Amino acid sequence: MPRLATYLPSTKKLVILPELLLFFTLTLLLAMQVQAQESGSKQIGGVITATNNGVSIIPSFTLGRPALLFDLSLSGERFSFDPMLRFGMDGKPWSFVFWGRYKAIKDKPFTLTVGAHPAFIFAERIVKVNGQEKTMFVSQRFLAMEVAPMYKFSNRLSMGLYYLRGHGFNPIPPDNSNFLALNTVFSNIPVGGDFNLRVNPQLFYLKVDDTSGTYITSNFSVSKPGFPIGFQALVNQKIKSTIPGDDFIWNVGIQYLFSNTFQKK
């Protein structure tokens, strides 16, 4: 039987997986199971985006070509399951991220959300199979946690921090990543025809293993309440960094938005 020895994680690699990340993931998965058994209002929705350039959760990383993005959500009062599925336009998977999130503080000007996810990043690699090099479609596996405090000053202005800690358990790097961002959100800005603009500028610091960098990015989205079509754009500029990647990244996309609320008894 062929062996993909090049891409099998070692036992040692699995043992040193940070206990905190594992704890977060198991706790949130258990909480989601509890939520599924509870009655109350649930909401299912999402955004499907077709873009000229797939951009990752960390905007300094991209697919580098057109992509189709599925951001889905099943949420209750406090818990939500938010899968993010990314594909190239050729139908090949790029990344699958399965978020579990908990709203620790809600319904107040100050909110706090924590979350965790397993993630799978797909790519074509040259690997050795029975001593011969072959090009195969393989996945890298990651586990991550997030903490997101936010303060809402008004219906149009919010500010907060976002921290993402990731760990890979693969035979190749990256092994550890830390992402810390200062967020500002300007929302409900009228742009005509009942359409509203949302702008999310972000200054962030990223550390990946022994490399690090500082960047500034901004997301723009235009949508209309009750209308399923929206538009988005992103720009990301490297300020100073030793992390490999483009100095400037941008994309534009068209979105399909949907949402439905139902009562579980």
Describe the role of every protein-language-model region.
Residues 45, 80, 109-111, 158, ...:
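Membrane-spanning beta-strand positions in outer-membrane beta-barrel proteins
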Residues 118, 122, 194-237, 242-244, ...:
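Outer membrane beta-barrel transmembrane domains
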Residues 38-53, 74-76, 81, 197-199:
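Transmembrane beta-strand segments of Gram-negative outer membrane beta-barrel proteins
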Residues 40-55, 61-64, 89-186, 235-237, ...:
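Outer-membrane pore/translocation modules
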Residues 1-42, 254, 258:
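Bacterial Sec-dependent N-terminal signal peptides
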Residues 66-93:
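N-terminal, post-signal-peptide region of Sec/Tat-exported proteins
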Residues 74-78, 190-192, 222-226:
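A generic beta-sheet turn/junction motif
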